[in-house]
Amino acid sequence: VVKGINRHSFSVDGGRATSAAMSRQDALLIKEMNMNAVRSHYAPDEHFLDMCDSLGIVYMDELAGWQNCYDEKVGSKLVKEMVQRDVNHPSIIIWSNGNEGGWNYQLDKLFAQYDKLQKRHVVHPWADFNDLDTHHYPAYLTGVARFTNGYKVFMPTEFMHAMYDQGGGAGLRDFWDRWNTNPLFAGGFIWVFCDEAPKRSDKGGILDSDK
């Protein structure tokens, strides 16, 4: 079962700038939290994939795109670059074509074209696609009804929004225990690994969601 976390490349000191040291720190923390899978909204730094390979963390490698998809001309180039770069990382178990409507169906076939040996599964996060139900943020009752009465493997690629302490994580046990009784449950990816705000020096040492 996938015990996953969504992760953005972010640190309080460097913002969106990354480093191998940051990748190591994040991967070790994810492992310590008993998580075994990671998803991002774009292809990660290779040094993060290296850490996933070495620690036995599986990864969902995603073509960037949210709500609005790439056209075929641009998207085909990006799929080629991403898959050819990452295809030999054993941590990658799934390719993701965009996020929450940001998928171009014409690009789906290209993943297998560059992943000729394994032809790993392609998903559309937030959709019921390719025999995998990945719908996001179900309420408890609707989630139980949808998933436990369904007929496809289900694995929400985002659920339990807990960023900036919005409280989503508080109900994780209730969701997880209920879903885990269903043999079609493949796990899921909670949102999100950490709050995303840079360290600031203009608040007199006060810590809040903006610091």
Where on the chain are the PLM-derived regions?
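N-terminal carbohydrate-binding accessory modules
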Residues: 1-32, 50
